[in-house]
Amino acid sequence: MVLEEGVIPGVTTLAELAPIIVLGIVLGLYELILIHRDESFRGSHWFGHGFHAIVFMFVALFFIFNTEYFLSITGLAEKEWPVISSTWGVRIIIGLILNIKMHAVSAVIKGGLRGSMTGGMAEHWTHTTVVSALVVLAPLYWPLLVGILPEWAGGVPAEG
């Protein structure tokens, strides 16, 4: 199925959205599991944070997979500014924003930013850094995953 060029700039087929959808669900659930392991969520808290984690992961991955396109349409690639004109510089900035967002959200689960047992959960920086690194490095490992994923998840069609 082909999308019109004006619907989502830079995306011409639904297959180009596969890495965002598949990795968004997997990494969003991974983020949720890390928090769920440390804190017993119930009912709407679990659903609310899960929905928030997955949606935010979709947004971050959309920007990560379309960084070159963004830099080209904004003209930032030609500016040659040290970090902002670099594809990896922008991806790392997105990863830092994602890392801080995850840590802040986990810190306020119980209503505090102190990061202690009484003030909030404050998910470990290690956990949030692992998730952020998986998001930032997604364009590198996605081609490896395509070979083992089913076709409906963006994998290579089976021959035969």
Q: Where do the protein language model's features map onto the residues?
A:
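Short, strongly hydrophobic alpha-helical membrane anchors
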Residues: 1-14, 156-160
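A generic, lipid-embedded transmembrane alpha helix
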Residues: 48-71
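Juxtamembrane boundary at the C-terminal end of a transmembrane helix
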Residues: 138-160
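Alpha-helical transmembrane-segment detector that highlights a single hydrophobic TM helix
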Residues: 65-108
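C-terminal ends of transmembrane helices
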Residues: 31-43, 100-111
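Membrane-helix boundary connector in multi-pass membrane proteins
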Residues: 101-126, 142-144
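N-terminal signal-anchor/start-transfer transmembrane helix
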Residues: 13-40
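Transmembrane alpha-helix entry/boundary detector in multi-pass membrane proteins
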Residues: 10-18, 41-55, 80-87
